[in-house]
């Protein structure tokens, strides 16, 4: 269903943008405050930082999920949903505690953004399902950690050092992907020279044509077996270079800084 694929692509992008936004504002901390010391998220509050923040969940990104319960549970998904709701709805100033799904919110203040980005009504498909811990952990790893490089292993990406245009490049990169449902079993292939580069472009080939490709062009999983996506699987692929040809592909930094400054000023000013 092409329409369902488009909707799921749109919702998946919104989900990723939520995470990117929170990575950025939490990492920037005090830099995101207005003249009253108010920010999008209260990173100075231990209660928020240790109990609700994305930064705390990020600390679990490399924890081995050794049991079936750990892999197939929904702790990370439920924690993110709670965080998204908190950012959207806020926690009123002057309230010391607020009941939340059988628990309580600690004493900190956060003003709801009421932004469409965090509105669950904009992501009805994702709202209707739960994501397993192993899936959410992989998403956090891909957004949090650099690629493995020699003896160094994977390092943590610092969102605090990202410039506005760099963050915009990530945004544009995500828009270069589109989603679709496999109409038949599809094999992943990649140019042999690019096989060690996980960011190189990947192609999907039906079983009937896989014989046209060499063994060193077949993408393999961790067990060394060819990667095959069953019929009905939802897949992301690069949508081509169309956006690079459009005016939306690049925005001068002076303009992005101006837009960011006054957008945040207007939003934070609503709290006063």
Predicted regions and their residues:
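Preference for the N-terminal adenyl/adenosyl cofactor-binding alpha/beta module
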Residues: 1-272
